[in-house]
């Protein structure tokens, strides 16, 4: 199963260097957001994609993300950090894996 990343240029470049299978860059123009929606729909329908990493800001602009079991769609912070804040991320991790993250 492939790991795919979608996001801004800096985030995508970092994941390319880390060895993700496929990476797609988008800016925040209306045309680019529409392309991102179409690419996400295409990726969700593919059988070879296991994880889609998408920056929080791009996911927010796209709107409703598909609710599917596979591939797993994970929202990740970009170079500016999380738009949801640290507390919400802790809560999400606690619910997902049952472990609370503390500093």
Swiss-Prot record:
InterPro entries: ATPase_V1-cplx_f_g_su (IPR008218), ATPase_V1-cplx_fsu_bac/arc (IPR022944), ATPase_V1_fsu_sf (IPR036906)
GO cellular component: plasma membrane
Coiled coil: none
Membrane topology: Peripheral membrane protein
Location of the protein in the cell: Cell membrane
Segments passing through the bilayer: none
Keywords: ATP synthesis, Cell membrane, Hydrogen ion transport, Ion transport, Membrane, Transport
A single BP term in Gene Ontology: proton motive force-driven plasma membrane ATP synthesis
Subunit relationships: Has multiple subunits with at least A(3), B(3), C, D, E, F, H, I and proteolipid K(x).
UniProt function note: Component of the A-type ATP synthase that produces ATP from ADP in the presence of a proton gradient across the membrane.
The protein, known as: A-type ATP synthase subunit F
Organism per entry: Pyrococcus abyssi (strain GE5 / Orsay)
